[in-house]
Amino acid sequence: MEQADTIIQIPHFYGSLKGMQDKFDKYARQDAFTGSTREEWEAWKETSRETLKDLLGWKYMETCDLAPRVEEVVELENGIRREKVILQVEPEVYMPMYILIPPKQSEEKQKCFLALPGHQGAGKFSVAGRNDIPAVKRMIEFYHYDYGMQLAKRGYVAICPDCRGFGERRDEALQKGTDEKSFLTSTCFHLAHMAEPLGETVAGMCTWDASRLIDYVYERGEWDTDDLGVVGFSGGGMQTLWISALDDLSLIHI
């Protein structure tokens, strides 16, 4: 219902998107691959990756020991073991995750997927299939958000992290106890406002964390890394897109 008595009608708007589109048309695609040999492709790929990392703010990210810590192990009814592990992705910056490990069907190493979360699902809780939490169950039913659990049911190890600002990584603005909206949503908006003046981006931070997660898979050494996969929905899909461009260690991207 319009409330015309409380506002005025704007006859013409002076938005910014047209100017941004013009700028995109002027400057975009200048670094497209134009070679014809494998050697030229490899050289272009490495140069492009460094450019992307610079745009994402990776030069400000700090490496450190992962220092993995197992906080919980739960045996689920379907035979899947759910581990809760905390990783240190930067000095004093921590990433909680669930690892869903199905029963082994052979002596071969199990194949593994990173299952990255998007918005409105409480981070890892939906992806890992926490139907015991009513609000999460509702999001799973609405968005089909439990793709980590679905992978585990099909025999894949599924690593389901909280990306920055989601789940247990929410910052102060949404640390509101039992408030459902705060629980389901994220503080990535607040992170973005802090990151931009530093030359960082939320996409860069999340992609960095995904790369540290890949480091953990290799360091742990229990699973097949020849076909390491990454899957994501919404913001998780964005992370999957970026990580597919930035490294060769993950080969399957959904």
Residues covered by each model-derived region:
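Gly/Ala-rich beta-loop-alpha elbow adjacent to hydrolase catalytic centers
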Residues: 232-236, 240
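Alpha/beta-hydrolase fold nucleophile elbow
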Residues: 223-232
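Conserved small/polar residues in nucleotide/adenosyl-binding loops
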Residues: 252-254
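Alpha-helix C-terminal capping segments
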Residues: 242-249
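Cap/lid segment of the alpha/beta-hydrolase catalytic domain
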Residues: 115-208
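N-terminal targeting or regulatory segments adjacent to alpha/beta-hydrolase or S9 domains
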Residues: 1-81, 89, 94
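Glycine-rich active-site/cofactor-binding loop and its immediate structural neighborhood
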Residues: 75-133
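Short, hydrophobic alpha-helix immediately C-terminal to the catalytic nucleophile
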Residues: 96, 241-242
